[in-house]
Structures are given as structure tokens and as C-alpha cells.
Amino acid sequence: MAYADVISVTNSDSAFDASKGVTRTNLPPFAQRLRKAADLVWEEGYRQPFIRELGEGTLPREKFAFYLLQDFRYLNDYARVHALGLAKTDDPEIMAFMLDVQNGALNVESTVHRTYLASYGITDEQMNNVRQSAFARAYTSNILSIAYGKDILDILVAVLPAAWVYGGLRISSCP
């Protein structure tokens, strides 16, 4: 899919309401087009046990705490990637999306993570000093490398799947 195809508005685009956050049913028009192009393989990801249990709120407490610690560390790198993407586009829609996601990662998700982790007896010091797992480090190194060295389309391709996966989950309860 060419960059021009991603940014061009079509009659099938629906409005994006930033106040509702990024969800599978509330995506910016450019993201709707990218998501639709991936429909054939996308649903398989939601059937993976970890993602399914996370979404259902049935993930065992130890796994959930480990996930939250890793995700807490990840959010800072994810926000950096969006800042770099913001600097690489002139498109107001994409700029607003990058800024909204960056703000959400730093000011909303991190606060939720801190609250859950504190309820598990994990201190701020432990949260801030946790080492990323090898997998998490490989992933964040990859998206940061793309953000530093590639253009906005490559950055969007790198970050949108995470926004779609976690935006699509409704975590109603936590173990």
C-alpha cells in the first residue's frame, strides 16, 4: 500500500473521535484503511492464548504482573517512537494521532499500570528499575530503529498493530 493510498480520504472512512481513544471501532481514517488490508490474518492474533486471557481478564496474576512491568517499561519507548513519528509528518491527522497516543501512553496507561502494580506490592523503584525481557527489548529496539531511520509510513506500520491489538481488547477485570 502506497503512502498516497493511506492518507487519501475515501467515502468509506468514518470519523475518528480522539476523546474515545483508539479502539477497533474508533480508528483514524488512515488506520481504518490499513487495518482493513490486514483483515485476513488479523483475527488469528486474537485467538492466541495470552491475548485471549488478557482480554477476558483470566490471565493468571503472576503473568499479568510480569506483563504490566514489561509494558510499563515499553510505554516509554512507545511514546518516543510516536514523538519521532510526529516530527516526520506534515499531515495534521497523523500528527494528532501520534500526539494522542504519546499522551495516552505517558499520562494514562502508565498511571493505570502504576496503580495495578502498587496493588501487587511493587514499588515505584522496582517499576523504574525492572529489566526488559529479551523479547520486549528486541521489539522496542526494532520500533525505535524504524522511528529513527525510516519515514512516517514505516513508523505507522511498526506501531499501529500494537494500538489495534490493545485498543481492541476490553479488559473488564484483572486477576
Give the positions of each predicted feature.
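Short alpha-helical hairpin
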Residues: 9-18, 22, 35-60, 78
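A ubiquitous short alpha-helical element
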Residues: 33-36, 63-70, 124-129, 155
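Alpha-helical bundle segments that constitute or directly flank the non-heme di-iron/ferroxidase center
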Residues: 39-44, 58-88, 108, 157-167
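Sequence termini and other peripheral, non-core segments
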Residues: 2-22, 135-142
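Short hydrophobic/aromatic-rich motifs at helix boundaries and adjacent loops
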Residues: 21-24, 52-57, 84-87, 113, ...
